[in-house]
Amino acid sequence: MIQRSIAGCDFARGGVDNTSIVVRNSYEIVEVVNLHHADTNEICSVYRKLDMKYHFKGTYLDATGGYDIGFYDALKDQYNLTEVNFAGKSLDPNCNNARTYIYDCLARAIKNGFYINTVKYKDIFDALKSTSYLINSQGKKALVPKEEIKAIIGHSPDATDALALSFYGSHDAMEIKVTPELQQQLINTLFR
């Protein structure tokens, strides 16, 4: 049986930021692809290849700023794509916007066992360590501004945003599915 994965895509156009596609399953990151100065055709091509390999059941796109429009229009009839505007409304009334919500979902997943290889995905780990939230004047969780995270890690947290996007509206990572292979891997790691 093929395990279907979920993807998150954070788009960039020019500058120093990357377009990042993060592929995950229910319990870990599977692959991260960072594209620098990629045009829509290249991003679509890379995405199609990843989908052939991982069989996405859903993909969440950063629609903030409209950089996803060409990608979305080209692929919306072929794939299960969901646009997420970071400044948009949160699905959780305790979070001030969609960006806070997706990071809150990611944090809950990590607390429940979602694994991030901190060596292989050091940039994601560093960005997560630099991300915090506060309670705003309306009593809701609010992430620190992205500029503060950039100042700490020295670049935009593109791959981390893509990973967080993959948790939008998702509850699958809240209940970690431990396959026999993962169980054996954990046993081998713990009892070396």
Each language-model region and where it sits:
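Generic detector of well-ordered alpha-helical packing
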Residues: 11, 63, 159-162
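Residue-level detector of short, conserved catalytic/binding motifs and their immediate flanks
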Residues: 19, 57, 160
